[in-house]
Amino acid sequence: MEFVTNEKLTIVGAAGMIGSNMAQTAIMMGLTPNICLYDPYAPGLEGVAEELYHCGFEGMNITFTSDIKEALTDAKYIVNSGGAARKAGMTREDLLKRNAAIAEEFGKNVKAYCPDVKHIVVIFNPADITGLITLLYSGLKPSQVTTLAALDSTRLRSELSKHFGIAMDNVENCRTYGGHGEQMAVYASTAKVNGKALLDIIGTDALTKEQWTEIQQKVTKGGANIINLRGRSSFQSPSYVSIEMIAAAMGGKPFRWPAGTYVSNGKFDHIMMAWETSITKDGCHLKEVKGTPEEEAALEKSYAHLCALRDEVIAMGVLPPVSEWNKLNPYIK
């Protein structure tokens, strides 16, 4: 079996549904033969490892450990789903306090045990904040830490596909930017349906303005809808898409969706948010984001919401004031 790389990939939170699915997805994609599974819950972790062994994959060196030092040492790529799970009735923001502390500890462990790691994808919520905290405490470059922010865009494509009764492949370039939550900015100007600009369809009998508003609302509540339907939070979609992200960072296929990345461009500053990017072996690089005046206003509103969350974390003492971030991580200007 051919692999994208032979370097070590560590899955943090591997005993959970997301983590275990990430591990299997990475193996089936042929990313690397060297995969380390980490989770503090040792019995569940061993169970996941046993299941993967029983799959009979060829050419794999799958290891597992509940020792974070062992898990991170020599790791070149990390995907972290090791936060507290979102439960029914909770927003991503409800998880802020608990998962902020987890992200801080993780960032410090990265700095201590694998400072030469090449790329990290953080997916535990609220990912915009946990990714930011990880970046600051790890001491890595902003291009080396990304967060899962694509599911809102994939959900937009799904909702448009269902509305028009067409294959999802016929709905192109769906994009949401800003926060990964109820305050995201859902864009219409980027998308095409059967080759036709979505903006030209909205307001017609095919898609009234009221129907478009309903679709936007469904997208912003897509994660909560999965919880209501399945009785648990999403795990298949975040597992797959996050592994697509790390695959791109390894030098695999280009990542097709927006990623959560550190933005500080004069208009939006000192924040982790969903943005148009390219992810390659050289890291995550920002592209231009353009929209209608209404969309740009929505993005500014989303940014303000993220800043409020960031400032709450600062008030909690998890992060220092923005003016002191450079002391914590010299790559943050």
Give, region by region, the residue ranges found by the protein language model:
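Conserved glycine-rich cofactor-binding loop
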Residues: A15
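N-terminal Rossmann-fold NAD(P) dinucleotide-binding loop
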Residues: G19-S20
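Conserved S-adenosyl-L-methionine
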Residues: M28-N34, G139-P142
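Hydrophobic Val/Ile/Leu positions in short beta-strands of Rossmann-like dinucleotide-binding domains
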Residues: I11-V12, L37
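Conserved N-terminal Rossmann-fold NAD(P) cofactor-binding segment
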Residues: N6, L31-K76, A84, D311-V318
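C-terminal substrate-binding/catalytic lobe of Rossmann-fold NAD(P)-dependent dehydrogenases
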Residues: S138-S143, S153-K333
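Rossmann-like NAD(P)-binding element
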Residues: C55-H119
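Rossmann-like NAD(P)(H) cofactor-binding subdomain of soluble oxidoreductases
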Residues: T91-E159
